[in-house]
Amino acid sequence: MANRFVLNETSYHGKGAIESIADEAKGRGFKKAFICSDPDLLKFGVTKKVTDVLDKAGLDYEIYSDIKANPTIENCQHGVEAFKASGADYLIAIGGGSSMDTSKAIGIVVANPEFSDIRSLEGVAPTKNKAVPIFAVPTTAGTAAEVTINYVITDAEKNRKMVCVDVHDIPVVAFVDPDMMSSMPKGLTAATGMDALTHAIEGYITKGAWELSDMFHLKAIEIISRALRGAVENTPEGREEMALGQYIAGMGFSNVGLGIVPVSYTHLTLPTNSRV
């Protein structure tokens, strides 16, 4: 049986990566962005780093900030309606896993309206159409959601999380800019960094691993192991290497899966409402 490997069409890495957003949008003929970003990122000026790029280029956008930790079915449904009303033709996800997951759900449902009941997307989703194009701008170095084919939505009614796996949801372009992560506090940097390291280790030992995924996971372990302490201290070098290391881990585990750790914290984070 052949092994499949799914990645972004394009990705930008390093300081100033977000400066390429305008060129990518114009080059693809996009007219208006629907920006998914949580209220804290708006409050502390992180989202503004991206909107400044769009403003400078004269590109239109609308900001949707009703992003919750552990996004629920209802959150995503509201997002779908807001997207439809906005007149946007692509999404920009700014944030950690929650913003990315919300954007993926919105993009998939808009492009595949027959799956408007998000519960029908749980597991390996049988969608036929690619999601509305997503530009992903991570602000944490942990989940690597900008390069993965899965997203997690909470069913609040049943108090459970649904993992949705769909090759059609992967962002078309990722902009992995360490400057977007520089405002993370030490505790969050450490926690997301360990999340990334766990992804790399589990991806390497999972049953689905093979030579190509091994290459990514081993390199990710190497980079994260030397970079995490520096990232916690907010050194430019540490931030940049962690941004790259967690992305490389995502390139691997998105294609071969993980182990028991994500299953465990899926249940542990429901009461605390945390998603990094």
Give names to the regions the model predicted.
Residues 1, 76-88, 179, 236-265:
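Short, hydrophobic/aliphatic alpha-helical segments
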Residues 22, 51, 62, 77-80, ...:
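Predominant activation on well-ordered alpha-helical scaffold segments within soluble catalytic domains
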Residues 74-81, 85-176:
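Glycine/threonine-rich beta-strand-loop-alpha-helix active-site module
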Residues 150-256:
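Carboxylate- and glycine-rich phosphate/diphosphate-binding segment that chelates Mg2+/Mn2+
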Residues 266-272:
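Conserved small/polar residues in nucleotide/adenosyl-binding loops
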